[in-house]
Amino acid sequence: EGLSSVTYCWQKNGNFSLLQLPNQWRASLYFPEELSPEEALSEDRIQQQLQDICPSTERFKIYDKRVYRVHQRIVDKYNHGRILLAGDAAHLNSPSGGMGMNGGLHDAHNLTEKLNKIWNGDDLSLLDLYSRQRKPIAERQIIKQADQNRKRMTEKDPTKRRKALAEMRAITEDPVKCKSFLMKSSMIEGLREADLII
């Protein structure tokens, strides 16, 4: 209660994020690197981490648990003949850094415009334009920003955490910086940049 539907937390004994879903919460728990995946996924360890986050007299019901290995990839080209790629099929980034779903929606929006024009008689070369417009945005914004978000979230050094919080606070206190940050993090800036590529 009292939490945002998406909550990222730094704490002394491990960072975590919470995502509210219908009738349940998804917890992404970060475990110390010295633990094996088996140790990290033990029922008792997960229960203890959840109790640290939200103390309860009852054990938490765990629907699924798995280790996610962070990796990022991007295809060379978003189209090959009549094969078209968008979203995670075109660019894969850490879900803890965000950006992937919205980036995929932006891919789909751009591609839909091209397909509509082709349906109405334009040349198939528009599919090459789709790839030229979306790939650099994925490289420079989606993957880069997701990686920065993930690194900030997993930072353990208290001094670096304080610095990151101070930087975020400075952004919120400056209307120009705030607007610039929002345009980038909402990926509106990327949509505009993509439209300039011919």
Residue ranges of model-derived segments:
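Core Rossmann-like FAD-binding/catalytic domain of the broad FAD-dependent monooxygenase superfamily
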Residues: 1-198
